[in-house]
Regions:
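N-terminal module of bacterial RNA polymerase sigma factors
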Residues: 1-28
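Conserved RNAP core-binding helix
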Residues: 2, 40-56
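Sigma70-family region 2
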Residues: 11-12, 51-66, 85-86
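Residue-level preference for short helical/loop micro-motifs built around acidic side chains
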Residues: 19, 31, 41-44, 65, ...
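Amphipathic, Lys/Arg- and hydrophobic-enriched alpha-helical face
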Residues: 23-40
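Structural recognition of an alpha-helix C-terminal capping motif at a helix-to-coil junction
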Residues: 45-52, 65-77
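Arg/Lys-rich amphipathic alpha helix in sigma70-family domain 2
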Residues: 59-62, 73-92
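Acidic, proline/glycine-rich intrinsically disordered inter-domain spacer in sigma factors
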Residues: 98-105
Length: 105
């Protein structure tokens, strides 16, 4: 099935077309995320989040524009959000450990 037809069906909420779109693109999203994230479980989480976001924003799909660009923009934003959460959590853990170290002395 042609990509524009799949996208038009996804846009109106066709779940089977979305499943087909997932099958066509999940590996591209996975490999793109792998460039920035090393944990395979985190990469899988990013892929899942990308497709959830895509489904939630399906009404904004413009079948005449570059779908790859749209998809990778979503992926990039989710990777940034993941990285921000990861580093904030890491920073918090480091702060707690420093606090514990001070109290142990």
């Amino acid at each position: 099935m042609k990509e524009t037809i799949i996208l038009e069906k996804v846009k109106v909420g066709d779940a089977s077309a979305f499943s087909l779109l997932y099958d066509l693109y999940w590996l591209k999203v996975y490999n793109f995320a792998r460039l920035y994230i090393t944990s395979s479980s985190a990469i899988s989480e990013v892929v899942q989040d990308v497709f959830v976001k895509l489904w939630e924003s399906r009404e904004f799909l413009d079948v005449t524009k570059n779908f790859d660009g749209f998809l990778f923009m979503i992926t990039r934003n989710i990777i940034f959000n993941y990285s921000r959460r990861y580093f904030n959590e890491l920073n918090f853990k480091m702060t707690v450990l420093k606090g514990l170290r001070i109290h142990m002395i």
